[in-house]
From Swiss-Prot:
It comes from Schizosaccharomyces pombe (strain 972 / ATCC 24843). SUPFAM superfamilies: F-box domain (SSF81383), WD40 repeat-like (SSF50978). One of its GO terms (cellular component) is cytoplasmic microtubule. It comes from the Eukaryota. Homodimer and heterodimer with pop2. Binds to cdc18, phosphorylated cig2, cul1, pip1 and skp1. Keywords: Nucleus, Repeat, Ubl conjugation pathway, WD repeat. This is WD repeat-containing protein pop1. One of its GO terms (molecular function) is dynein complex binding. WD repeats lie at residues 444-472, 484-538, 575-603, 615-645, 657-687. One of its GO terms (biological process) is anaphase-promoting complex-dependent catabolic process. It is found in: Nucleus.
Length: 775
């Protein structure tokens, strides 16, 4: 035997009818592949020990046991020959070849020598001087099978790590004339073998077959095409047979392609990958996407402590949190089960708890919803309201209807069903909010109606006829008439006592009015008049029988006669020396603003004047209360806004900025807004923490009336109804234009109503920003 290169596997055909054939393994790097455990065998190891599995390794994959692989050396050319198994399909043969080349390559390992059938053992041993040498090793990657039928055997012998060598199944039916020997050539680490096909014994000519041989019983007698790998150079070349498919040829090039790809520059790699992907089918690209997607997904939130995760989430706005919740189930739980997160976002966005939120909370508790679900629902109510107003479509649903026979509109109040308007006349008109149809007119007063307020179906009105009247809005019937004032009634308020709940939620407590012993007073009516007095009346129930006043002469209705003749009369608050323009109330506290330049703080349950607030120069036109801080805020003709402590009566702060009469000041949701008459003509938004003016909403023609909440201001000037973003101070849009004057403005969650003068006629304009159901 010629000496071969070290660590190569050589197989020598020893049959006298064959020429010498040497099979040489390709140079495959297997340094990273796990080595099988190898045990040394004695030359005297019996065939029984091998066949019974003593010191023999486990089974190789079944698909590899059906693969035919042959190595050949002709002259200086070294090659590897792969022969198709005709019992398998082309696809299965291709998969086997891929497995051989890339999965189980372990060619440079010693292999096992086995005994041959007794008839041929002696002949073969004579021709193998080095057979069964002391250096024989067993590769435990292979399984040996033996089936006994008399003295004849079907035996499976190991070959390289790629396949098994075995006798055909029909060996038992004929005289066994095949010889297969395996010997280990120690110096060259090579194995020699020979094999005769039994189905060719009848011929003098012997045909060399690659292993494993095919059964003679097979109906496929066609030769299978070999694929030759050329390993004669450092870069192996491929010599495909004329009948080899292009797919197998491409598979054999993969090793070289992969090796070359790793050496390419990054830009060339990207170029090559682009063209490869563009030539892939849809399913292949989907599988690649599944592999790549987890690489670029970083679930960093799961690696943080809960405190850090919450801190990260608190820096996101509502749309971002909604996007986060859609990333995964885990992130959805982080967002949807964190009550503190939604509370923080609620306050950060400048929202405030109101009575509707309390109703939502009660409804959710009845449905057994979690605290987080309640807070989330309340937040999105406020968020959607703001978005609906500030980002409304260009065309808003609008309804206009005229008001006939009036000279002036003194007050407007509405809900989703009705709009109530008082005019400078004894008449009070009630319209349908959706259609503008006049529902009814109330005409019991004998003088002009200047003020009113309603709660539910109870309407209370004040007039220049110096009476307070209580109406049933369901029927339009006047239920009660209260006498006592001696001049025009300028202001009416209905106080229903302390309506705060027992809930301890921090968000609610931030905006809830203080108690002030309101439970000691039943629901009552406040009426203030130009007669310098404030009168308190119990709020009648609509089912109470009408009170008949025995003495309708107002001059004779003093405190004594009212107390004895009117069961609804409570008391009169005296102290002001001029007309009481406006009153504000908080539970048991009443704050009155007068033209005498003072404000007075009263205790309603006792009638005691707690404080006289002096500081304004001139008339006080407007007053409002900050319930969370126990403060009242006033403004008047001196163009100053003053902030007072209700408990001590101390002047806390004076806000400067307006240059003319401040006709209106309102406090809502922790935001203070004031309006000044011409030539100032500005709305100012104030920061109560610093006393500075946060924004100036300038209108050339001045603001006559306005209303605001946590997100917006709706103001009416002489010719335009405008919508402002209170957070930025910017004008969002003009809601109405080309008007003569705007007298009154009011809005709720979904609807804005304005009383305007256009072309010398009075109109009610209704603008709809959403439905009640959407709220």
């Amino acid at each position: 035997m010629n000496e071969k290169k070290k660590d190569s596997l050589s197989v020598l055909d020893s049959n006298e009818f064959f020429g010498e054939t040497t099979m040489v393994s390709p140079s495959i790097d297997v340094s990273s592949s796990p080595r099988p455990n190898v045990e040394r065998f004695s030359p005297c190891s019996t065939k029984k020990d091998l066949l019974e599995g003593n010191n023999i390794m486990t089974r190789i994959p079944e698909e590899l046991s059906r693969v035919s692989l042959q190595f050949d050396s002709k002259g200086s050319q070294q090659s590897m020959i792969f022969t198709n198994n005709r019992c398998l399909s082309d696809k299965e043969n291709l998969e086997n070849l891929q497995n051989l080349l890339y999965l189980h390559c372990d060619l440079n390992r010693p292999h096992l020598s086995c005994e041959l059938p007794s008839e041929h053992r002696e002949k073969c041993l004579k021709r193998r001087n080095s057979s069964l040498s002391s250096n024989l090793h067993a590769n435990k990657r292979f399984l040996f099978n033996s089936q006994s039928d008399g003295n004849k055997k079907n035996e499976t012998f190991p070959s390289t790590n790629y396949s098994n060598v075995f006798y055909p199944n029909n060996c038992d039916s004929k005289e066994v004339a095949s010889e297969t020997t395996f010997s280990l050539d120690a110096p060259n680490n090579s194995v020699n073998y020979s094999y005769f096909s039994p189905n060719l014994l009848g011929n003098d000519s012997k045909t060399r077959q690659s292993f494993p041989p095919h059964s003679s019983s097979s109906s496929h007698n066609s030769l299978h095409e070999p694929v030759i790998y050329d390993f004669s150079s450092e870069n192996p070349s491929i010599h495909p047979s004329n009948h080899l498919s292009s797919q197998k040829n491409a598979v054999l090039k993969l090793a070289q392609l992969i090796s070359s790809f790793e050496k390419l520059p990054e830009s060339v790699r990207q170029y090559l990958l682009f063209h490869l992907l563009s030539r892939c089918g849809k399913h292949a690209v989907q599988n690649i996407h599944k592999i790549l997607l987890p690489i670029f997904q970083k679930n960093f939130l799961t690696g943080f402590p809960a405190e850090i995760t919450n801190l990260v989430l608190t820096h996101l706005d509502a749309p971002s949190l909604c996007a986060v919740s859609q990333v995964s189930h885990h992130w959805y739980k982080l967002v949807s089960s964190n009550e503190e997160l939604w509370k923080s976002l609620f306050l950060k966005d400048g929202f405030f708890w109101d009575s509707i939120d309390s109703k939502i909370r009660t409804m959710c508790l009845e449905q057994s919803l979690s605290a987080c679900a309640i807070m989330k629902r309340v937040y999105f109510r406020h968020f959607n309201l703001r978005e609906r107003w500030l980002h409304a479509p260009e065309k808003i649903k609008r309804c206009s209807f005229p008001i006939h026979g009036v000279r002036l509109i003194t007050k407007l109040q509405f809900d989703d069903d009705k709009i109530i308007v008082s005019t400078c006349s004894p008449r009070i008109n009630i319209y349908d909010t959706k259609t503008g149809v006049l529902i009814r007119s109330l005409e019991e007063h004998e003088g002009d109606v200047w003020t009113f307020e309603y709660v539910g179906d109870t309407l209370v009105t004040g007039s220049t006829d110096r009476t307070v009247r209580v109406w049933d809005l369901r029927t339009g019937e006047c239920k009660q008439v209260f006498y006592g004032h001696t001049s025009t009634i300028r202001c009416i308020k209905i106080v229903q006592g302390n309506q705060s709940t027992t809930d301890t939620d921090d968000v609610e407590k931030e905006n809830r009015p203080a108690s002030n012993d309101a439970n000691s007073m039943p629901p009552y009516i406040i009426s203030s008049s130009r007669d310098c007095t404030i009168r308190l009346w119990s709020l009648p129930c609509l089912d109470d029988p009408p009170f008949v006043n025995v003495n309708e002469n107002p001059d004779q209705n003093n405190d004594f006669t009212s107390a004895t003749t009117n069961p609804f009369y409570i008391r009169t608050l005296r102290g002001h020396t001029d007309s009481v323009r406006e009153v504000a109330c908080l539970g048991d506290l009443i704050v009155s603003a007068s033209y005498d330049g003072t404000l007075r703080v009263w205790k309603a349950s006792t009638g005691v004047c707690l404080h006289v607030l002096r500081g304004h120069v001139g008339r006080v036109y407007s007053v409002t209360i900050n319930p969370s801080r126990q403060q009242c805020i006033s403004a008047g003709t001196d163009a100053k806004i003053r902030i007072w402590n209700l408990e001590s009566g101390e002047l806390l702060q004076t806000l400067h900025g307006h240059s003319n009469l401040v006709s209106q000041v309102t406090f809502n949701q922790n935001i203070l807004v004031s309006a000044s008459a011409p030539p100032d003509t500005s709305l100012r938004v104030w920061d109560l923490n610093t006393g500075s003016c946060r924004d100036i909403l300038k209108c050339p023609l001045g603001h006559i009336f306005f209303q605001h909440d946590e997100s917006k201001v709706v103001s009416g000037s002489h010719s335009t109804l405008q919508l402002w973003d209170i957070r930025s101070g910017k004008l969002v849009r003009d809601l109405l234009t080309d008007l003569d004057i705007i007298w009154q403005v009011a809005y709720n969650e979904n609807v804005c109503v304005a009383a305007v003068l256009r072309n010398n006629r009075f109109w009610i304009e209704v603008l709809e920003f959403g439905s009640t159901k959407s709220s």
